[in-house]
Amino acid sequence: MRAALIAALFFAVPTPSPAQFYAGIGISIAPPAIPIYTQPPCPAPNYLWTPGYWAWGPGGYYWVPGTWVLAPTLGYFWTPGYWGWSSNAYFWHRGYWGPTVGFYGGINYGFGYFGTGFVGGRWIGRNFTYNTAITNVNRTVIHNTYRDVTVINQNNHVRTSYNGGRGGIQARPTSYEAASRNQGRAPTTEQKYHEQTAGTDRNHLATVNHGYPRTTAVSHPYSATNRPPHYTPVTSSDRQAAQQHVAVPGSGSRPQGNRPPQGNHPPQ
């Protein structure tokens, strides 16, 4: 019964209001570090990069590959979600769309999301213009580009994937960033399906890939016709192991394994 409830909470895909961007289930262990990976080329004009992240599902933490998507509205930016430490557990703050980039925990997701704001491109009228110093763009296909190498210095190279708590990023939102969340729009149905599909593939589980997922990024979101390669379903053993780490807020549960691994590079 508990496993079914957890699955329903994480894999249902309603359209939440801004007040629902906070996931209510706490996890007693921290997510792994953000892996280092290569961004696939932008497939077409006006596609925006949504960086990969660690989500939680019935099988535990799993990697949601970074991917290119269209914004639900021209002029909107993506603010990534993040894990935050509160009430003796880690809680997920969902990402959202909006006219500005808000607070995403100070997490360095790479590719222009270096902890604050976004420097990988900007909207000029109805066209998104890409900063080729950061973003992987084929300029024979996409012509709205510029190059600003000065923003590369904003990359702090820290790959910790959660805010607050022991070993976490100690950033706090500005009043401007907090206001941005209030104007936020939920992830698209395409994004939700992408996340849900990744969570059903055992190869994406942190307990299986040990923080180094085989598929870190894809050009297009997972869909009914674009399934994960080498797909393997999550097992009942995976679900049972994950349930041990679902915390009850305020229960006094303490964080476990919440120090990021040293040397966040794939094994040679």
Each model region followed by its residue ranges:
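Cleaved targeting-peptide boundary
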Residues: 20-27
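Bacterial N-terminal signal peptides
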Residues: 2-12
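A short, compositionally biased domain-edge/stem linker segment
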Residues: 9, 33-36, 251
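N-terminal targeting signals for Sec/Tat export/insertion, comprising classic cleavable signal peptides
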Residues: 28-50
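General zinc-binding finger modules coordinated by cysteine/histidine
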Residues: 46, 50-71, 83-84
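Low-complexity, repeat-rich tail regions
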Residues: 20, 69-268
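Sec/Tat signal peptide C-region and signal peptidase I cleavage site
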Residues: 15-19
